[in-house]
């Protein structure tokens, strides 16, 4: 038997996820590898989810815990829209997630989250949440998982405060690509999305391959 703290470390060590705040929206990206110890358990793991028309979220950690949380939050977002006629704002969604996580703080959900969204009044928003509900509103970029040190190196070098979504997509893909080359627990492709005034756009593998070719030409 392993302790809760040891269990937490085991499930929080893998993956790479990144989020960038752009002047016209938010970019989110993840790898696709799911690990169980030293075993690559899944090469097509879904770690990027559309929560609402203007909100998307990345997950790291225990898949079961994260998927359970996503089902709850997605349902609450739909109920909110049915009752009010409006989409839930990114801040409201983040606060709701924080409350759920904090309510389970004595036996926490083993997941670390990045939430990106677009508020038609307040613009683009980027948040990160820890397993017990702590919220950070990010003013530039963030990364989670075992590949995050490498990803942060690229983000620090490439990110600019006036970055657009078009440039942010390339930066995010470059950060993920670099992390996957150096981190054994990250790999097997990239999931990518942006959120702006028009909503959430999830990119296809072919589109992501196009971004990778652009990056490789510049190297």
Swiss-Prot record:
A matching Pfam family: Proteasome
A single cellular component GO annotation: proteasome core complex, beta-subunit complex
Enzyme class: hydrolase
UniProt cross-references to SUPFAM superfamilies, sorted A to Z: N-terminal nucleophile aminohydrolases (Ntn hydrolases)
Cleaved propeptide residues: 1-14
Compartments where located: Cytoplasm
Protein name: Proteasome subunit beta
């Amino acid at each position: 038997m392993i302790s809760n703290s040891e269990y937490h470390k085991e499930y929080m060590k893998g993956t790479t996820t990144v989020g960038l705040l752009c002047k016209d929206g938010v970019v989110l990206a993840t790898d696709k590898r799911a690990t169980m110890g030293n075993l690559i358990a899944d090469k097509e793991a879904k770690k990027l989810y559309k929560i609402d028309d203007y909100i998307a979220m990345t997950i790291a950690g225990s898949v079961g815990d994260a998927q359970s949380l996503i089902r709850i939050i997605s349902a609450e977002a739909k109920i909110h829209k049915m009752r009010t006629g409006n989409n839930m704002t990114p801040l409201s969604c983040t606060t709701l997630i924080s409350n759920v996580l904090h309510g389970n703080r004595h036996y926490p959900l083993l997941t670390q989250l990045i939430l990106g969204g677009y508020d038609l009044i307040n613009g683009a928003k980027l948040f990160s949440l820890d397993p017990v509900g702590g919220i950070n509103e990010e003013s530039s970029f963030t990364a989670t998982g075992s590949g995050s040190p490498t990803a942060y190196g690229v983000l620090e070098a490439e990110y600019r405060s006036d970055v657009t979504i078009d440039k942010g997509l390339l930066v995010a893909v470059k950060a993920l690509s670099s992390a996957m080359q150096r981190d054994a627990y990250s790999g097997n492709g990239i999931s990518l999305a942006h959120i702006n005034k028009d909503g959430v756009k999830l990119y296809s593998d072919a589109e992501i391959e196009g971004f990778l070719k652009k990056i490789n030409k510049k190297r």
